[in-house]
């Protein structure tokens, strides 16, 4: 029977430690980490994510603010809002909730954020730092996965890691983080032939494709570690991941559940990176 990798419990533990660090920072330096979340439009799923971030920031003891903007806002107007918070010393982290309306260029908006305040880790400068082995701001989901692997003492050096999904948010940065730990990494996608056969060689399998229960037992080798990033609804409307959990757990050594695995760690890493940005602001 597999060990269930409890991301929720790890997130709670890290959040408690973060509260203590924030309290010490406030006491010693008179600085409170500040996070502003900019929300364009009224996407229901995005609203849920934003509320979760608000709660986490408040719990950590941050100064936080949510800016709600009309879906009809122009790209230039949105950039002006971002520039305002780039210049505001009270805010150390700026997050623009994605997706954005079609008339706004996501890349132009990401470029507008000060890289020092880009707590999502999507600015090309932060991406470049990651690929050059000098990461500062790292996309939060891959960062959270690395914390889970560390917590459960998963050996990466010399191991074979396979990632399903090549997004800029998870797959690509995840590959680089694993390479930094001396894993041998294969990044797969929708055009990868014989996908199950490729995945079956993995000591560590990370799945991030957004397809409910796509990965079955034929994809995993005996004793593998499986990280499920997906969050979907099955035919009965229940939350599930990209991995068929009930099938796969009988074959692997460790696996993250959905919910309660990767998800809680993503928001926790967002808070941690905001705290780290506040620390770096002391150095100018």
UniProtKB/Swiss-Prot annotation:
Catalytic activity annotation: (6R)-5,10-methylene-5,6,7,8-tetrahydrofolate + NADP(+) = (6R)-5,10-methenyltetrahydrofolate + NADPH; (6R)-5,10-methenyltetrahydrofolate + H2O = (6R)-10-formyltetrahydrofolate + H(+)
BP GO annotations: L-histidine biosynthetic process; methionine biosynthetic process; purine nucleotide biosynthetic process; tetrahydrofolate interconversion
Molecular function per GO: methenyltetrahydrofolate cyclohydrolase activity; methylenetetrahydrofolate dehydrogenase (NADP+) activity
CDD domains the record matches: NAD_bind_m-THF_DH_Cyclohyd
One GO cellular component, as annotated: cytosol
Gene3D superfamilies the record matches: Leucine Dehydrogenase, chain A, domain 1 (3.40.50.10860), NAD(P)-binding Rossmann-like Domain (3.40.50.720)
UniProtKB keywords: Amino-acid biosynthesis, Histidine biosynthesis, Hydrolase, Methionine biosynthesis, Multifunctional enzyme, NADP, One-carbon metabolism, Oxidoreductase, Purine biosynthesis
Entry binding sites for NADP(+): 165-167, 190, 231
InterPro entries hit by this protein: Aminoacid_DH-like_N_sf, NAD(P)-bd_dom_sf, THF_DH/CycHdrlase, THF_DH/CycHdrlase_cat_dom, THF_DH/CycHdrlase_CS, THF_DH/CycHdrlase_NAD-bd_dom
Enzyme Commission number: 1.5.1.5, 3.5.4.9
Pathway of action: One-carbon metabolism; tetrahydrofolate interconversion
Pfam families, alphabetized: THF_DHG_CYH, THF_DHG_CYH_C
Subunit: Homodimer.
Family membership: Belongs to the tetrahydrofolate dehydrogenase/cyclohydrolase family.
Stated role: Catalyzes the oxidation of 5,10-methylenetetrahydrofolate to 5,10-methenyltetrahydrofolate and then the hydrolysis of 5,10-methenyltetrahydrofolate to 10-formyltetrahydrofolate.
Protein name as catalogued: Bifunctional protein FolD
Species per Swiss-Prot/TrEMBL record: Streptococcus thermophilus (strain ATCC BAA-250 / LMG 18311)
Gene: folD
